[in-house]
């Protein structure tokens, strides 16, 4: 199974961003993920952002996708993170054309009320 792993770093003034990313594929199931820590992006806080995605080609032109995203604007404060599960399908009916069908389910940590689910249809083309 092919494996990809890497890291990134950026510093500009007081702002600093560093992260790791990776991915692998086995028997058609593909995983990609990334974790980043930012210093001084939101005020003077240390922030954390991450995502993890699994994709599986059911047949040519149809992929099922499950993704988890997390953003914590201040890792030193408990219960201030936003997380989201995304479930959907990527349909490729023609070359260079994609239709994304997704349901997004967002959760706020702490005692806050969670937002209603979001449903997305996106048309995407490239060249």
Regions found by a protein language model. Give the residues of each.
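Gram-negative outer-membrane beta-barrel proteins
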Residues: 11-15, 39-43, 72-76, 107-111
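Repeated loop/turn-to-beta-strand initiation elements of outer-membrane beta-barrel proteins
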Residues: 2-5, 28-33, 61-64, 95-101
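Transmembrane beta-barrel strands of outer-membrane/channel proteins
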Residues: 5-11, 33-37, 52, 66-70, ...
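Outer-membrane beta-barrel architecture
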Residues: 21-23, 53, 88, 102, ...
């Amino acid at each position: 199974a092919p494996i990809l792993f890497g890291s990134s770093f950026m510093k500009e003034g007081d702002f600093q961003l560093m992260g790791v990313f990776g991915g692998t594929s086995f028997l058609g199931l593909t995983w990609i993920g990334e974790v980043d820590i930012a210093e001084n992006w939101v005020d003077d806080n240390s922030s954390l952002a991450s995502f993890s995605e699994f994709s599986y080609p059911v047949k040519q032109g149809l992929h099922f996708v499950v993704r988890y995203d997390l953003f914590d604007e201040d890792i030193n404060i408990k219960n201030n993170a936003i997380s989201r599960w995304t479930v959907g399908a990527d349909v490729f009916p023609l070359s260079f054309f994609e239709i994304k069908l997704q349901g997004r389910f967002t959760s706020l940590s702490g005692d806050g009320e969670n937002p209603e689910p979001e449903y997305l249809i996106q048309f995407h083309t490239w060249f």
